[in-house]
Structures are given as structure tokens and as C-alpha cells.
């Protein structure tokens, strides 16, 4: 493990919340706290991506997004990192595989909103992600039906588990939890010029 990389010990469970965080906002904080409480995680790492292959416009500079995320998310069990840039990975499947190599003995859980589950089947090697690590899905009101009808949810319907044991589950495994609404999005914040 390199200097400056987040710490995690053998046997610990780390939730991975990836995104551009352009900008990070209270909705990210909210789902992070929910994930810590509901999925049996020791840590959550915000993986601030160098770029998002599914978005047409480049994000703000990585260092700025990481600094602003750290200023917003102050929790003793949360780490903000730009580790994907150091790993040289572009896609989530590569990032997860790289983290598993760099942190043997650490269990990882991929975290996502239900809006991402609804289009997860469009991600590069999404089925490899499901095969490598459990996936924790957090749904705001109104997102449940579309997400549960999504191709990924249908294909892995038999791998759905209860939320509390997700951190100890063998992949493929996923859990779906409803969370109270915090109506914020990075796109809307950028459009208003608040970023």
C-alpha cells in the first residue's frame, strides 16, 4: 500500500462510493451515513474519479473536487480519495479488481444509488463487478420500481440479501434499502452555478 492511500485492516469491510463528486453534496453525505448504518461497514471510501466515461463533459480538477469533498464529509469512518487516478483505472470493474489486489484481506462492498442500478447493465463489465464484490443499493422514494425491474436486478435476483449481512456476504450478493429523500444532485448544483 502506498503512502497517502486510505487505511483498512485485514478483515475489515469497506464500502466504495464512486463518482465524480462534481460537486459533492449533502445527498452523498446522507447515503454514506445510511450505508455505514445499514450494510455492516467499517469504512466508506469516496472514490473521486478522474473522469466519468458515461458523462460528456469533463469534471472540475480532481484535487479541487477531493478538497471540497473532504470539507463537506467529516466523519471518522469516511475517507475521501483520488486513488483511481493513481491506480490508472478508467472503469469500475478495473478499480475494484485493483483495490482487491492492493488490499488483500479487506472486504469491499460497491455502493450505488438505485438510479445507477437502473442503468448498471450499461456499465463496462458490470457483471464482473457483481462477481467480485457485494453491491449495496440505496433508493430514494420513487426509484424503487425502475431499479428492481432493471436487467442487473433481474439477472441477479437470486443473489439479493438482507442489508445487515451484506458486508460479510460472498459475491455475487446485493442488498436494496430505501432511504429518506434528500433531493440534491450534482447536475442541478452545477446548473445553478453554485459550484
Swiss-Prot record:
It is an enzyme of class 2 (transferase). One of its GO terms (molecular function) is nicotinate-nucleotide adenylyltransferase activity. Keywords: ATP-binding, NAD, Nucleotide-binding, Nucleotidyltransferase, Pyridine nucleotide biosynthesis, Transferase. It comes from the Bacteria. Its EC number is 2.7.7.18. It catalyses: nicotinate beta-D-ribonucleotide + ATP + H(+) = deamido-NAD(+) + diphosphate. Pathway: Cofactor biosynthesis; NAD(+) biosynthesis; deamido-NAD(+) from nicotinate D-ribonucleotide: step 1/1. CDD domains: NMNAT. Pfam families: CTP_transf_like (PF01467). One of its GO terms (biological process) is NAD biosynthetic process. Catalyzes the reversible adenylation of nicotinate mononucleotide (NaMN) to nicotinic acid adenine dinucleotide (NaAD). Belongs to the NadD family. This is Probable nicotinate-nucleotide adenylyltransferase. The gene is nadD.
Amino acid at each position: 500500500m502506498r503512502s497517502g492511500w486510505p487505511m483498512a485492516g485485514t478483515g475489515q469491510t469497506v464500502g466504495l462510493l464512486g463518482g465524480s463528486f462534481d460537486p459533492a453534496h449533502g445527498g452523498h453525505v446522507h447515503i454514506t451515513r445510511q450505508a455505514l448504518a445499514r450494510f455492516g461497514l467499517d469504512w466508506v471510501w469516496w472514490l473521486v474519479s478522474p473522469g466519468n466515461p458515461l458523462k460528456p463533459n469533463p469534471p472540475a480538477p480532481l484535487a479541487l473536487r477531493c478538497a471540497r469533498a473532504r470539507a463537506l464529509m467529516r466523519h471518522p469512518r469516511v475517507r475521501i480519495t483520488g486513488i483511481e487516478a493513481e491506480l490508472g483505472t478508467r472503469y469500475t470493474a478495473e478499480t475494484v479488481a485493483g483495490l482487491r489486489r492492493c488490499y488483500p484481506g479487506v472486504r469491499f462492498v460497491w455502493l450505488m444509488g438505485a438510479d445507477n442500478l437502473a442503468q448498471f447493465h450499461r456499465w463496462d463489465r458490470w457483471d464482473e463487478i457483481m462477481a467480485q464484490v457485494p453491491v449495496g443499493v440505496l433508493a430514494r422514494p420513487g426509484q424503487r420500481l425502475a431499479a428492481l425491474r432493471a436487467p442487473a436486478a433481474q439477472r441477479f435476483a437470486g443473489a439479493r440479501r438482507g442489508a445487515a449481512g451484506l458486508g460479510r456476504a460472498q459475491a455475487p450478493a446485493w442488498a436494496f434499502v430505501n432511504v429518506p429523500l434528500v433531493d440534491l444532485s450534482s447536475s442541478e448544483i452545477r446548473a445553478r452555478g453554485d459550484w
